Amino acid sequence: MVISAERTNVGFITQVIGPVVDIEFPSGKMPAIYNALRIQGKNAAGLDVAVTCEVQQLLGDNRVRAVAMSSTDGLVRGMEVVDTGAPISVPVGTATLGRIFNVLGEPVDEKGAVNATETLPIHRPAPSFTQLETKPSVFETGIKVIDLLTPYRRGGKIGLFGGAGVGKTVIMMELINNIATQHGGVSVFAGVGERTREGNDLYNEMIESGVIDKDDPSKSKIALVYGQMNEPPGARMRVGLSGLTMAEYFRDVNKQDVLLFIDNIFRFVQAGSEVSALLGRMPSAVGYQPTLGTDVGALQERITSTTEGSITSIQAVYVPADDLTDPAPATTFAHLDGTTVLSRSLAAKGIYPAVDPLGSTSNMLQPDIVGEEHYQTARAVQATLQRYKELQDIIAILGLDELSEEDRLTVARARKIERFLSQPFFVAEVFTGAPGKYVTLEETIKGFQMILSGELDDLPEQAFYMVGNIEEAKAKAEKLKA
């Protein structure tokens, strides 16, 4: 939220080039880089115009070049510009929960003003080395497939890959629900350069599933910050920082565990590339900005665990033309601790969450971090599923009967594992009617060990579908027998 500035430093517009505005100030009164500038006046039609810009370059001759955070329609040369003397600041604290904001921290959900007592600037340094939590610890999500095969690091960054309609949103909402109920944490969702319709759908789905309480927003579990596709590149480039600033307050002041969702991290890079070209910088590889690594690093280095609390970030990653060597995803990968890949073939089988157990990775899956038992169980599950995958062509051509006894047993266990990796979600209760399940890591490991050891070879595979822990699978098998 840009506070109405005192008119101590006033300049005027000298040039407008799309979303970029050049402004001249009196000699000796140049605003600092990243300062917010406020332009207010009337356009040619006599209508009020109010635009906030951010200083990006000092051009010399008392002129600065700034990037607008909203449309520059109606701006004319000679219009007055007020230097606010500070960067863009956004409201922070529990008053932000259940509300939707734009890049400037202004509410856009037509629910009135926000009762936040504090605002913070969106440009802040990353925590110092002495404040960081150095011991890696696993962040339990209660989702079996994630906790077993791609454990999330507390304060880590996870890339979420998946096409349309494979369940990205549902996984996000389940994580938001679980961090609130099991960890007493909150979430912040930064919608960076995605479709307005999707933002609206997400908000309505969150109300339906109880993540947002429409009647009493303070009971909500999430704050939303949107900068959609139709916004100028300045807004799309900065909205990620606005969301991150809100998350940092929950971590540093409220000392909570925070989940920060960024959808989509590629659009953040894309917006930076547009702004870079508008500012006249020489493009780098594939037309990206020369400061690509710095821009991504400035955002990513602030997402971390401190000794007080943590920000664990889940970032949807769009891969242009499926080219993983493109500079935008390649730069992002350098910061990720793990990847959660969603598979359309699993979704088609009705196995939700449709996380690909062989395609997803995590650098937390090491015996010295998760323990020998967890590590060996996860690797055995992956080996069984990999063998099943190799045998599928033979099964398709010759049938199951042509397999050796050992391979038939592997296939039977793999099919049970595949089904046991599914589970009913709390946020999907309203659609499926099945109560959601939170499964602890201990129960998850125990369940898969029992399947691998052959203890449950006599149970039908449908008993493992859409259940929580292994005891529920046994109970379901008893029911199926009856």
UniProtKB/Swiss-Prot annotation:
Gene3D superfamilies: 2.40.10.170, Bovine Mitochondrial F1-atpase, Atp Synthase Beta Chain, Chain D, domain 3, P-loop containing nucleotide triphosphate hydrolases. F-type ATPases have 2 components, CF(1) - the catalytic core - and CF(0) - the membrane proton channel. CF(1) has five subunits: alpha(3), beta(3), gamma(1), delta(1), epsilon(1). CF(0) has four main subunits: a(1), b(1), b'(1) and c(9-12). GO terms for cellular component: plasma membrane-derived thylakoid membrane; proton-transporting ATP synthase complex. This is ATP synthase subunit beta. It comes from Thermosynechococcus vestitus (strain NIES-2133 / IAM M-273 / BP-1). ATP binds at G162, G163, A164, G165, V166, G167, K168, T169. GO terms for molecular function: ATP binding; ATP hydrolysis activity; proton-transporting ATP synthase activity, rotational mechanism. It is found in: Cellular thylakoid membrane. CDD domains: ATP-synt_F1_beta_C, ATP-synt_F1_beta_N, F1-ATPase_beta_CD. Coiled coil: none annotated. SMART domains: AAA. It catalyses: ATP + H2O + 4 H(+)(in) = ADP + phosphate + 5 H(+)(out). Belongs to the ATPase alpha/beta chains family. It is a peripheral membrane protein. Keywords: ATP synthesis, ATP-binding, CF(1), Hydrogen ion transport, Ion transport, Membrane, Nucleotide-binding, Thylakoid, Translocase, Transport. Produces ATP from ADP in the presence of a proton gradient across the membrane. The catalytic sites are hosted primarily by the beta subunits. The complex from the organism is particularly stable to disruption and remains functional after 6 hrs at 55 degrees Celsius. Pfam families: ATP-synt_ab, ATP-synt_ab_N, ATP-synt_VA_C. The lineage of its organism: Bacteria, Bacillati, Cyanobacteriota, Cyanophyceae, Acaryochloridales. It is an enzyme of class 7 (translocase).
